[in-house]
A protein has these predicted regions:
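Eukaryotic scaffold repeat domains enriched in small/polar residues
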Residues: 21-378
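Positively charged n-region of N-terminal signal peptides that target proteins for export
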Residues: 1-5
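Bacterial N-terminal signal peptides
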Residues: 6-19
Length: 378
């Protein structure tokens, strides 16, 4: 209790002392968008572009909700089939291939990331899985477990034992029959998804530190960050549902910096929380709207991007913020809308090049490549 109180006091103090609290205006960063970026085959449609990432060669990976869905709902499981698709394009936007077609863990796409070795990681919210592909497109690691693909009925209640059925001559003093058997015993309770450890419940994103440790944003229902070693062995997790520091309400996006600090987009609490590599709370940034996507650039001077992208019923302004890692806002760009250079719920950002970023949009069903001009911000 005392530790929680100390964390809260520290967070409040950092907020009032931080440059965020003092900033009254944010410069607008000019930018351009490349028209008709992705060249799709005639029979292929993109769908909701929930994930976008690039590799060291400039190839573009897009994780989409493109297929038709088939939902079967059990009493404690929901099974959704055939909605995730993963496409690869070259650096010019030319279509290269589809990866993982028909994969058992592809159900409801959420994000895609490319690690420093050019492995491709997809996060599937529907299957509760994180899946790693090597650059050739082979599955080399799976984390989490897909819920059962069949209906899971509730165990029937036990039948009450009926009264004994008597036969023969009652006057003889003994029953002529035996008591009827009881019905079948109830099945043991089944655990739902999201048990502690490496079982996820609607995970959303993944990141790595320099040692290769894996951080999974776990996500909608577990309200935690789970840490694994480079081989996928579970180490620890932190977080719970709530509004205090180190608590979350939809862990929607995650990134790490060169020092191994972990930045978590706490979407419904409308803040970014920062932790050290072991999950100890460090800071929070609270004036960048609802962070649907965060991305940290590589290189010696790292920048943090965060998208403020609520849905159509609560759109906000739809802008993207460019920040220092300490939370100082350097500028913003974009607004909600359907035209080029406007955004329809930016769900993921790729920022391998700090001034050339890719954004995947849900409601506009597209990916935009943006060229920023921060030196012209005003």
């Amino acid at each position: 209790m005392m530790r929680s109180f100390q964390i809260l006091i520290a967070a409040v103090a950092m907020f009032f002392a931080s440059p965020l609290f003092a900033q009254s205006s944010v410069p607008e960063i000019p930018y351009d968008s490349a028209p008709n970026l992705l060249k799709l085959p005639d029979n292929l449609y993109l769908g909701e572009a929930v994930g976008v990432a690039t590799n060291s060669k400039g190839h573009i990976y897009v994780f989409t909700r493109s297929g038709s869905t088939n939902v079967t709902t059990g009493t404690n499981r929901a099974f959704v089939r055939s909605s995730s698709r993963l496409f690869e394009f070259d650096q010019t936007g030319k279509y290269v291939r589809e990866m993982g077609q028909g994969l058992y863990g592809f159900i409801f796409a959420h994000a895609v990331r490319v690690d420093p070795q050019d492995n491709i990681w997809v996060i599937d919210e529907g299957s509760n899985m994180v899946i790693k592909f090597d650059p050739e497109g082979r599955v080399v690691m799976t984390m989490g477990r897909k819920p059962e693909a069949i209906r899971v009925p509730a165990a029937p209640p036990p039948l009450a034992a009926p009264a004994p059925v008597l036969g023969g001559n009652p006057a003889a003093g003994g029953p002529g029959g035996a008591p009827a058997r009881e019905g079948p015993a109830p099945s043991p309770a089944r655990e739902g998804a999201g048990a502690p450890g490496d079982n996820f419940d609607r995970p959303t994103d993944v990141a790595w530190d320099a040692a290769g440790n894996i951080f999974v944003a776990d996500g909608y229902n577990n309200s935690r960050v789970a840490k694994f070693d480079k081989d996928g062995k579970y180490i620890k997790s932190w977080g719970s549902r709530g509004t205090q520091p180190s608590q979350f309400h939809t862990v929607h996006t995650i990134a790490t910096d060169a020092k191994g600090n972990v930045y978590v987009g706490d979407r419904e609490n409308r803040r970014i929380q920062v932790f050290d590599n072991d999950g100890n709370f460090k800071s929070m940034y609270i004036n960048v709207g609802a962070p649907w996507a965060v991305c940290i650039t590589p290189g010696q001077h790292q920048y943090l991007y965060s998208s403020n992208s609520n849905g159509t019923a609560d759109m906000d302004n739809g802008e993207i913020y460019r920040m220092e890692l300490d939370g100082k806002i350097l500028g913003k760009f974009g607004t909600a809308g359907k035209q080029m250079k406007e955004f329809g719920s930016v769900h993921e950002i790729d920022c391998r090049n700090p001034n050339e970023i890719y954004v995947g949009e849900i409601t506009n069903w597209r990916v935009q490549k943006l060229t920023l001009h921060p030196d012209q911000a005003k």
